[in-house]
């Protein structure tokens, strides 16, 4: 009881030693004593307890370009694509010769999705325009 802790009934330290210090002299606060719950088994520095099953070791999307690309689109875009797939206008008929026609959304939606994901309006024509302007400036300087 009180004799073990070294405190009298008022909570004062009656034996003179500092009960908040470990045997080696380091200060130990009550928070540190409560926080010392052990290794949670993960590779991180967050020790949350013995039976923690938090999958902190998994890095989702790293090395997966498709996952990053999907992450660039808004949730509303993905919802719209799903709704378009549900309300497929042509009744699900497929044309093996035209893969774009097999998609449940049209060319306009594809273009919008392409532009929202950072695509260029020029789609490769930018190189031709740049080379053309470069040659014009070169001939003007000669």
Curated annotation (Swiss-Prot):
Q: Which UniProt keywords apply?
A: Membrane, Transmembrane, Transmembrane helix
- Bias-annotated ranges (Acidic residues): 1-47, 54-64
The answer, when asked if Acetylation is one of the entry's keywords, is: no
Basic and acidic residues bias (residue ranges):
65-74
- The residue spans the entry assigns to the Cytoplasmic side of the membrane are as follows 142
Segments passing through the bilayer: 124-141
- Where is it made, tissue-wise? Component of the acid-insoluble and acid-soluble organic matrix of the aragonitic skeleton (at protein level).
Q: Where, per UniProt, does this protein localize? A: Membrane
Residues assigned to the Extracellular compartment are 1-123
N-terminal signal peptide: none
Membrane-topology annotation of the record: Single-pass membrane protein
Q: Which GO terms describe its cellular component?
A: membrane
Q: Where is this region: Disordered?
A: 1-74
What name does the UniProt record give this protein?
Answer: Secreted acidic protein 1B
Q: Which organism is it from?
A: Acropora millepora
| Top-level taxonomy | Eukaryota, Metazoa, Cnidaria, Anthozoa, Hexacorallia
């Amino acid at each position: 009881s009180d004799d073990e802790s070294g405190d009298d009934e008022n909570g004062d330290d009656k034996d003179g030693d500092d009960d908040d210090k470990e045997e080696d002299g380091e200060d130990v606060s009550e928070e540190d004593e409560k926080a010392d719950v052990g290794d949670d088994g993960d590779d991180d520095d967050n020790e949350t307890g013995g039976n923690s099953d938090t999958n902190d070791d998994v890095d989702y999307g790293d090395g997966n370009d498709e996952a990053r690309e999907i992450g660039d689109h808004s949730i509303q875009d993905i919802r719209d694509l799903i709704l378009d797939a549900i309300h497929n206008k042509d009744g699900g008929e497929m044309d093996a010769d035209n893969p774009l026609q097999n998609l449940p959304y049209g060319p306009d939606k594809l273009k919008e999705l392409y532009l929202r994901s950072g695509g260029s309006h020029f789609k490769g024509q930018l190189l031709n325009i740049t080379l053309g302007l470069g040659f014009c400036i070169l001939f003007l300087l000669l």
